[in-house]
């Protein structure tokens, strides 16, 4: 106990020493190379004479580096000379502590840690770590991987990509122990950010397979790394890698991560990953089919980005927030046509705005173009969650928050047009538009010639800028008052940009049933679609639509009947329920699981209908799963209702047992006691595939209710639940 307190006091003192002012630090220059023969620190070299640095931050970074670099060099020297495993472990621990303390420094932690990480590489420490990752001692590999994960800044990722990917991939084949898996998943998380080529190499050589395998584990830190690794892979890997991720069922494996009830950070990172995948039109349908995408918007709406930002700051590996390149990737989500991508992108940028405002580094948002994208969401987004997050981010960044644009543009009066002109930066033309009495209808049908001749916009570049804004307005506008056949959404399904043509088409009296009869010349001259490629694509899709009837609302799609309904207790069974969903989907079963997205008034009806429609009823018996059913004689508990419905409909009931203790039959209401007569299968986290195979046998027509014979216990996985 005393040693623990002394060690904690030592760490606290050293933290304040590193972050405190340097004695005599009154000069604002970084010394250049010492021409008298001495050597200056490597991070100060490279200029002629002294180089000026910005006041405040530059001095703090310089001072922190001057204090910590000698300790780092000493620790690296001892590590290089160490031969015994114990000495190597002590050296790795010392270097790790120095780097971790640097990352935790407020405001300047990223710059100081960057300096230490560069020093480790330049002093040969990075190459040494790659060798230690191949050591025979497991503990050495674990510690080396833990340190490597901490120092993978951009330049170090370059080095690992050149000489160390094979080492990392060999480590990823060691699926155990969890301590090693955590760090290897963290290393892959960073390396997926390196480049599209590196992502492709990692995916092709098994790195993605390792991450997907670890998604079935229960360790929170490991699962967070997996979620972020998949998000980075999707963000930086390009469309080819995204297609490969979908083929390997990454969207399905993200479901249990996004469905977790214990870890909000994990859920958010998983939602980010699946939202990025959904932005790829080639795989969008497969991602939707996974069911994971439906979790994104409800989760984001329920969370506070300020609290999320505090969680990031409190963690050593995320305390500095994201760098400019990562932020740039998030900005791309704001420009997506998918609501889920806009929503999660706005949430992350709002949290990052909170972090950067504390650090005094908000300028990065202007540099990467985030301000305009956030303002556009505020102006045009019809989703309240997305718009609110964008407003909050702009306020944190000290930016003006624009007014929301009314979506029914065709119904605008002249005053709304004037407001829009001011908002997009064309105030100087307000008088001309007012003199010509331009309303929403005229605005949507405005031509280049009219803009130049009648409205006095002489500069062709200015007109291009104006039409860029007008195209965006047309794309986000609502045409519900004039678009009876929902032509806008059909055009948007072909390409989000095609929504801009809606008003021109409906103004000519066209709808979806007539579009295939129109010629390309009519689309050009009457409807104003100037781009020939767009005309060809629209006509081609319209003619194909003849063979695909319009969706009707009267019937129920045949695919709406699930093979399996999963019933579970939220507080103890959600993780297993989500894992079962993924495993069963991968084996071809359609699965219904309540994702808490149902409207309040329809909750009971929808659940009961789903139980009745499903062919099989899987009951997750986790710890205390039936406790709320006891004494529930009015059948108000949801699990109770689901069980009673399954029994009354004679469903094939398959109980899955995980840490469940049997109640006395008399303790349960009479209408559900029969559930205890069904044979159950004991869930094994270590042997998931074998357990799933047994579950599938129960689902494929072998009844689980058998009061005489009991169930097959050869797997050590089935448990008889018969009444005494």
Swiss-Prot record:
Residue ranges annotated for the TIR domain, each copy included: 560-703
Pfam families named in the record: SAM_2, TIR_2
Gene Ontology cellular component terms for the protein in this record: axon; cell surface; cytoplasm; dendrite; extrinsic component of synaptic membrane; glutamatergic synapse; microtubule; microtubule cytoskeleton
Chain spans, region Disordered: 703-724
Cell compartments where the protein resides: Cytoplasm; Cell projection, Axon; Cell projection, Dendrite; Synapse
Name used for this protein in its record: NAD(+) hydrolase SARM1
Binding annotation for NAD(+) 2: 569-570, 599
Lineage: Eukaryota, Metazoa, Chordata, Craniata, Vertebrata
EC number: 3.2.2.6, 3.2.2.-
The keyword Cytoplasm is annotated on this UniProt entry: yes
Effect of residue 548 to A: Reduced infarct size, neuronal death and neurobehavioral dysfunction in response to cerebral ischemia/reperfusion (I/R) injury
GO biological process per UniProt: cell differentiation; innate immune response; modification of postsynaptic structure; NAD catabolic process; negative regulation of MyD88-independent toll-like receptor signaling pathway; nervous system development; nervous system process; protein localization to mitochondrion
The keyword Cytoplasm is assigned to this record: yes
Active site: 642
Activity regulation summary: Autoinhibited: in the inactive state, the enzymatic TIR domain is held apart by the autoinhibiting ARM repeats. NAD(+)-binding to ARM repeats maintains an inactive state by promoting interaction between ARM repeats and the TIR domain, thereby facilitating inhibition of the enzymatic TIR domain. Following activation, possibly by nicotinamide mononucleotide (NMN), auto-inhibitory interactions are released, allowing self-association of the TIR domains and subsequent activation of the NAD(+) hydrolase (NADase) activity. Self-association of TIR domains is facilitated by the octamer of SAM domains.
Function: NAD(+) hydrolase, which plays a key role in axonal degeneration following injury by regulating NAD(+) metabolism. Acts as a negative regulator of MYD88- and TRIF-dependent toll-like receptor signaling pathway by promoting Wallerian degeneration, an injury-induced form of programmed subcellular death which involves degeneration of an axon distal to the injury site.
Transit peptide: 1-27
Positions where Phosphoserine occurs in the chain: 548, 558
């Amino acid at each position: 106990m005393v040693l623990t307190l002394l060690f904690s006091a030592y760490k606290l003192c050293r933290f304040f020493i590193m972050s405190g002012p340097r004695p005599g630090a009154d000069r604002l220059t970084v010394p250049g190379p010492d021409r008298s023969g001495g050597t200056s620190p490597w991070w100060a070299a490279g200029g002629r004479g002294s180089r000026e640095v910005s006041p405040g931050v530059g001095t703090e970074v310089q001072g922190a580096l001057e204090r910590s670099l000698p300790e780092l060099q000493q620790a690296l020297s001892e590590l290089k000379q160490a031969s015994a495993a114990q000495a190597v472990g002590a050296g790795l621990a010392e270097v790790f502590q120095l780097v971790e303390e640097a990352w935790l420094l407020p405001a300047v932690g990223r710059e100081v840690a960057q300096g230490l990480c560069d020093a480790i590489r330049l002093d040969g420490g990075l190459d040494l770590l790659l060798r230690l990752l191949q050591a025979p001692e497991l503990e050495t590999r674990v510690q080396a991987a833990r340190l490597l994960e901490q120092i993978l800044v951009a330049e170090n990722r370059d080095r690992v990509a050149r000489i160390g990917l094979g080492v990392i991939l060999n480590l990823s084949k060691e699926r155990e122990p969890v301590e090693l898996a955590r760090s290897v998943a963290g290393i892959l998380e960073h390396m997926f950010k390196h480049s599209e080529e590196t992502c492709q190499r990692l995916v092709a050589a098994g790195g993605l397979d390792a991450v997907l395998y670890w998604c079935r584990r229960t360790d929170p830190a490991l699962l967070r790394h997996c979620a972020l690794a998949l998000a980075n892979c999707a963000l930086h890997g390009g469309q080819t890698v995204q297609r490969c991720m979908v083929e390997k069922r990454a969207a399905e494996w993200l479901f249990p991560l996004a469905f977790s009830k214990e870890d909000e950070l994990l859920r958010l990172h998983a939602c980010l990953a699946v939202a990025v995948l959904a932005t790829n039109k080639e795989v969008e349908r497969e991602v939707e089919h996974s069911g994971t995408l439906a979790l994104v918007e409800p989760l984001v709406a329920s969370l506070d980005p300020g609290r999320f930002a505090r969680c990031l700051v409190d963690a050593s590996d995320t305390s500095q927030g994201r760098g400019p390149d990562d932020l740039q990737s998030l900005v791309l989500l704001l420009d997506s046509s998918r609501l889920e991508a806009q929503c999660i992108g706005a949430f992350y940028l709002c949290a990052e705005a909170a972090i950067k405002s504390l650090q005094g580094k908000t300028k990065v948002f202007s540099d990467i173009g985030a301000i305009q994208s956030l303002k556009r969401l505020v102006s045009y987004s019809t989703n309240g969650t997305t718009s609110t997050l964008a407003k909050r981010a702009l306020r944190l960044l000290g930016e003006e928050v624009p007014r929301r644009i009314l979506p029914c543009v065709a119904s605008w009066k002249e005053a709304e047009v004037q407001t829009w002109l001011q908002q997009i930066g064309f105030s100087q033309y307000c008088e001309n538009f007012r003199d010509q009495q331009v309303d929403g209808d005229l605005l949507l049908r405005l031509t280049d010639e009219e803009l130049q001749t009648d409205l006095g916009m002489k500069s062709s570049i200015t007109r291009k800028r104006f039409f860029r804004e007008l195209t965006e307005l047309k794309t986000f506008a609502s045409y519900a008052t004039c678009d009876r056949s929902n032509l806008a959404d059909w055009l948007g399904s072909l390409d989000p940009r095609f929504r801009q043509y809606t008003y021109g088409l409906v103004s000519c009296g066209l709808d979806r049933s007539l579009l295939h009869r129109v010629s390309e010349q009519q689309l050009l001259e009457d409807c104003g679609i100037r781009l020939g490629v767009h005309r060809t694509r629209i006509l081609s899709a319209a003619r194909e639509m003849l063979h695909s009837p319009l969706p009707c609302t009267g019937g129920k799609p045949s695919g709406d009947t699930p093979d399996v309904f999963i019933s579970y207790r939220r507080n103890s069974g959600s993780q297993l329920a989500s894992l079962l969903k993924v495993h069963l989907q991968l084996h071809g079963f359609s699965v219904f699981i309540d994702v808490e997205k149902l409207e309040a008034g329809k909750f009971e009806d929808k659940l009961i209908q789903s139980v009745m429609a499903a062919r099989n009823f899987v009951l997750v018996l986790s710890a205390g799963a039936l406790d709320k059913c006891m004494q529930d004689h009015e059948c108000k508990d949801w699990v109770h209702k689901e069980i009673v419905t399954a029994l009354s409909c004679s469903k094939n009931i398959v109980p899955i047992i995980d840490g469940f203790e049997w109640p006395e039959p008399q303790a349960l209401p009479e209408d559900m006691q029969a559930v205890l007569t069904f044979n159950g299968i004991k869930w094994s986290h270590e042997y998931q595939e074998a357990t799933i195979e047994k579950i599938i046998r129960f689902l494929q027509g072998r009844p689980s209710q058998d009061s005489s014979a009991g169930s097959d216990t050869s797997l050590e996985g089935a448990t008889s639940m018969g009444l005494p």
